[in-house]
């Protein structure tokens, strides 16, 4: 999973957002666990936002909120989801 995420990071740096999104999805889906999966989902949400896909970015942060409430990323996911919901409603 970590290799998928690192590849996603490289594509994100290159601005190849569709590829980054694909690799982050693979990273999050590979042997899901409480520690790494929320990290990969956060990267996925960021890539969605950079691609202008606020709906999927919000849904990804929502997934972190509902499935990983004990994760370090939980509070940041809540904050970013609220921010994006505000942008989406304008």
Label each region the model flagged.
Residues 1, 28-36, 65-76:
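Short solvent-exposed coil/turn linkers within tandem alpha-helical repeat scaffolds
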């Amino acid at each position: 999973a970590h290799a998928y995420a690192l590849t996603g990071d490289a594509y994100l740096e290159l601005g190849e957002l569709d590829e980054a999104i694909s690799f982050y999805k693979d990273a999050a889906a590979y042997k899901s666990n409480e520690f790494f999966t929320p990290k990969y989902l956060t990267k996925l949400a960021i890539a969605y936002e950079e691609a202008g896909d606020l709906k999927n970015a919000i849904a990804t942060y929502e997934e972190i909120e509902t499935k990983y409430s004990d994760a370090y990323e939980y509070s940041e996911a809540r904050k970013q989801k609220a921010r994006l919901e505000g942008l989406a409603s304008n």
